[in-house]
Design a protein with these regions (language model features):
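Conserved RecA-like ASCE ATPase "motif II neighborhood" in helicase/translocase motors
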Residues: 1-5, 217-220
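Loop/turn-to-beta-strand initiation segments
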Residues: 6-10
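Conserved helicase motor core of P-loop NTPases
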Residues: 12-163, 169-172
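Conserved nucleotide-binding/hydrolysis modules and their immediate coupling elements
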Residues: 136-235
Length: 235
C-alpha cells in the first residue's frame, strides 16, 4: 500500500518516568530504535535553575544523595519561603505524627494553602505505617472526622473527602488517577456523588470499589499530576 504524508506526529514523554505497571515501554523503545528524530528538552521552566527541588531531583536521578542543607537555613522566624525541606524523625510512628502536623497545620498556615486539596502526601507503598492506606485513615480522622459518610469494605467515605478514581470508566467518563471530592452520600442506599473537574459522578454499591481516599497516594499514581505542596515519607 502507499500513503501520502500530510503532517507529523510528536510523542512527548519523560525519559525518567517510572516504568509502566503493565507491558510496554513505548517511549524508550522508540528512542532506542534510532528510526525517528529525537529531541531532548533539558531546560526546566517550572522551577528556577537553583531551586532545591530541581537540584535534588537531578541528584536522585543520578543516584546521588540529595542536598539537605536547605533545611538548616530556614527558621520559623525567617520570612523567606524555600521550596524544599528535609525533616528527620526517629521511627515510622513519629513520621506519621509529623506528616499530620505538617499537612494540616504547618504547611497550610505558612504557605496559605488548603490542607484538603493543595497539599498531597506521596508515599512509595500502599501498606505499612507510612503507606497510603494507613496515612489516609489518619489524615481523614484529622481533616474530615465528623462529616456524614458510609462504610464500604472497611473504609469510610465521608462528604468532603478527597478521593481518586482507580480505573477507567468510559461510561461515566472518569479515568484512572482522576481526583475528586465527595459532595453527597446516602448510607442507606450506599450511594456517593463525587465532584470531579467537569462533572459530578454517581457511584452505588460495588461501583464504590472504583474509588479510594486520596489524602495520601502512591508516587506511581501521582505521575503526570502537580500539587502546590508535597510531603514524601521515606523510611
Amino acid at each position: 500500500f502507499s500513503f501520502t504524508r500530510i503532517g507529523s506526529v510528536s510523542a512527548p514523554g519523560d525519559v525518567d518516568q517510572l516504568p509502566s505497571v503493565g507491558a510496554g515501554a513505548v517511549l524508550s523503545d522508540l528512542i532506542e530504535s534510532r528510526s525517528i528524530p529525537v529531541v531532548r528538552l533539558d531546560h526546566i521552566f517550572r522551577q528556577a535553575a537553583d531551586s532545591f527541588i530541581t537540584v535534588n531531583a537531578h541528584k536522585v536521578r543520578r543516584g546521588e544523595m540529595p542536598d539537605f542543607s536547605s533545611s538548616n537555613r530556614q527558621t520559623e522566624d525567617d520570612n523567606q519561603l524555600l521550596d524544599f525541606y528535609f525533616i528527620k524523625e526517629s521511627n515510622p510512628e513519629k513520621i506519621v505524627e509529623k506528616i499530620l502536623l505538617m499537612s494540616t497545620e504547618r504547611i497550610p498556615q505558612r504557605f496559605e494553602l488548603d490542607p484538603m486539596m493543595d497539599t498531597q502526601v506521596l508515599t512509595p507503598m500502599h501498606r505499612g505505617v507510612t503507606g497510603a492506606i494507613n496515612l489516609n485513615r489518619k489524615l481523614q480522622d484529622v481533616i474530615n472526622p465528623d462529616a456524614k459518610g458510609l462504610e464500604h469494605r472497611e473504609q469510610w467515605f465521608r462528604i468532603g473527602d478527597k478521593v481518586m478514581q482507580q480505573q477507567n470508566d468510559y461510561e461515566k467518563l472518569v479515568f484512572n488517577g482522576d481526583l475528586g471530592r465527595i459532595v453527597n452520600c446516602d448510607p442507606k442506599t450506599k450511594e456517593l456523588h463525587v465532584q470531579f473537574d467537569q462533572q459530578i459522578v454517581h457511584y452505588q454499591g460495588k461501583e464504590i470499589d472504583q474509588l479510594s481516599l486520596a489524602y495520601a497516594i502512591t508516587v506511581h499514581k501521582s505521575q503526570g499530576s502537580e500539587y502546590s505542596a508535597v510531603i514524601v515519607p521515606l523510611t
